[in-house]
């Protein structure tokens, strides 16, 4: 069913959930895995960059480290992942990379936001559901590493 799964990852708890659920789905379907980390270029980051030269470069360096850890974890699970770290607006970058790699499933984490925060920052999920040309899984099932590896073991991994 799914042959090319894109995992959106930012190192957060929600990103970890997306990584776990996406890896389980990819394993179940025998899919190729793609990983994307987006350094969000938000107004806050631009303000930080204006007052602290190098703030964006530091944020990118942090994300590169998170990306490498996630890639290593996926390799340990038997995947041969491909991916990259980009800077920009997460929803736009995820949709663009999904088209680029011809993904048939995109997995993102769910981060709860208040009404004001949703209005101010926009809706990544809504943008993706409108702009993706493939299925979208919004990972919400927070499982521990033990449960995750147990599910992989019972799946024949």
Regions inferred by a protein language model and the residue ranges of each:
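Conserved beta-strand positions in the Rossmann-like core of class I SAM-dependent methyltransferases
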Residues: 34, 82, 137
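A short acidic, glycine-rich active-site loop
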Residues: 52-65
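Structural beta-alpha unit
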Residues: 72-106, 143-157
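Glycine-rich, Arg-bearing micro-motifs that act as flexible, cationic patches
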Residues: 108-131, 145-149
């Amino acid at each position: 069913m799914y042959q090319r799964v894109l995992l959106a990852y930012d190192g957060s708890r929600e990103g970890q959930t997306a990584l776990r659920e996406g890896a389980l789905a990819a394993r179940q379907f025998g899919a190729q895995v793609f990983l994307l980390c987006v350094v969000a270029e938000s107004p806050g980051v631009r303000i930080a960059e204006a007052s602290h030269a190098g703030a964006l470069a530091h944020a990118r360096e942090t994300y590169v480290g998170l990306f490498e850890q996630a890639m290593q974890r996926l390799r340990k699970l038997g995947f041969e992942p491909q991916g990259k770290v980009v800077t920009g607006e997460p929803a736009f970058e995820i949709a663009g990379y999904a088209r680029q790699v011809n993904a048939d499933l995109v997995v993102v984490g769910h981060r709860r936001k208040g009404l004001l925060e949703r209005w101010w920052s926009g809706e990544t999920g809504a943008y993706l559901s409108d702009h993706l040309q493939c299925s979208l899984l919004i990972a919400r099932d927070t499982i521990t590493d033990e449960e995750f590896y147990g599910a992989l073991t019972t799946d024949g991994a």
